[in-house]
Amino acid sequence: MNKLTFSRELRLLAPIQFKAVFEQPYRASTAELTILARQNCVNTPRLGLTVAKKHLKRAHDRNRIKRIVRESFRLKQHQLPNFDFVFVAKHGIGKLDNATLFATIDKLWTRHIRLSQQAQSKN
């Protein structure tokens, strides 16, 4: 049975890890958010979150977005490729309700799964 936890090993913690993803990422985005990805050397997908105060002024709004993204990642982690993912919030993300945000993120995860399969088939 697969564990559906979001442990420390599944998180991007150091700035150098984020920088590696920002250098040459695969992108999947909508008007409100972007998920960047880059292949990693570990055998699990990892997630980093960036939600700028510029886009969401209140801490509870930023925390809501991060909580939904973490939950989505936690449920989808065993289907995702071994990539480092960075979630980037854009202007207007605060206007999305929880269900819409969850569905949008799920669609972007699916797009990243497809992108990784295409990249593997080229190699």
Swiss-Prot record:
It catalyses: Endonucleolytic cleavage of RNA, removing 5'-extranucleotides from tRNA precursor. The keyword tRNA processing applies. GO terms for cellular component: ribonuclease P complex. GO terms for biological process: tRNA 5'-leader removal. Its EC number is 3.1.26.5. One of its GO terms (molecular function) is 3'-tRNA processing endoribonuclease activity. Keywords: Endonuclease, Hydrolase, Nuclease, RNA-binding, tRNA processing. SUPFAM superfamilies: Ribosomal protein S5 domain 2-like (SSF54211). Pfam families: Ribonuclease_P. Coiled coil: none annotated. InterPro entries: Ribosomal_Su5_D2-typ_SF, Ribsml_uS5_D2-typ_fold_subgr, RNase_P, RNase_P_CS. Consists of a catalytic RNA component (M1 or rnpB) and a protein subunit. Belongs to the RnpA family. RNaseP catalyzes the removal of the 5'-leader sequence from pre-tRNA to produce the mature 5'-terminus. It can also cleave other RNA substrates such as 4.5S RNA. The protein component plays an auxiliary but essential role in vivo by binding to the 5'-leader sequence and broadening the substrate specificity of the ribozyme. NCBIfam families: rnpA. This is Ribonuclease P protein component. It comes from Haemophilus ducreyi (strain 35000HP / ATCC 700724).
